[in-house]
A protein has these predicted regions:
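Short coil turns that delineate tetratricopeptide repeat
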Residues: 50, 94-96, 137
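Terminal, low-structured helical/coil segments at or just beyond the last alpha-helical repeat
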Residues: 152-156, 160-195
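TPR alpha-solenoid repeat register
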Residues: 55, 98-101, 142, 176
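N-terminal leader/linker segments that initiate helical-solenoid repeat arrays
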Residues: 3-41
Length: 195
């Protein structure tokens, strides 16, 4: 059991680093190819460890991030797959990765179109993101996505507070590139609010 958990943890770390490189250092065809390869790796890891909520969360994160860069029906298929991964992770352990499935599912709900095209819902987004911040009040991602949602809702004061919390979040072990990239996104959002 310990060996299986260790192997899964290594896989999660590899997926995290791969995501950060693909998201913040690559673009164009190189980025697309890397995301596609990471999704295949995540699917294999989940197939080998179907009850691992962290692998499910990362499978969903990879699909949802790539969907944001894709278009048309392929993007819709990716976001539906991501939602399924997050929902499975929540059903296994909603506290995994400090409630990251709530953060990621909430982000999907406000970023995808609503019915009849997809499943987007500002109401569900707010519920999920508020739960995420409740579970991880000092987290960079929980506060960033909550702030981004509030910004889209034109709740500028609350968005600024959330972004400032995200900016002040402690660095995560082994996530230097991801944290640096996210802080850049936060500063950009804050500049938009303040201009």
């Amino acid at each position: 059991m310990v060996l299986a958990q260790s192997a899964a943890a290594t896989t999660v770390q590899e997926l995290q680093l791969g995501w950060a490189v693909a998201n913040y250092e690559l673009d164009g065809d190189n980025q697309a190819a890397r995301f596609e390869a990471l999704i295949i790796e995540a699917e294999a890891a989940v197939e080998a460890n179907p009850k691992d909520p962290e692998l499910l969360i990362w499978q969903g994160i990879l699909k949802s991030t790539y969907a944001g860069k894709a278009s048309g029906l392929s993007a819709l298929s990716l976001v539906k797959g991501a939602r399924s991964s997050f929902e499975k992770a929540l059903s296994i352990d909603d506290m995994a990765m400090q409630g990251s499935a709530y953060t990621s599912l909430g982000a999907l709900y406000y970023q995808v179109p609503g019915w009849p095209i997809a499943f987007g819902s500002d109401k569900k987004a707010r519920q999920m993101l508020e739960k995420a911040v409740q579970l991880n009040p000092a987290g960079i991602d929980s506060n960033y996505f909550h702030g981004d949602f509030l910004l889209q809702q034109k709740e500028y004061g609350a968005a600024k507070v959330a972004f400032e919390k995200a900016l002040a979040a402690p660095d995560r072990l082994g996530r230097t590139l991801a944290d640096s990239g996210r802080r850049g996104e936060i500063r950009s959002r804050l500049a938009n609010i303040e201009s």
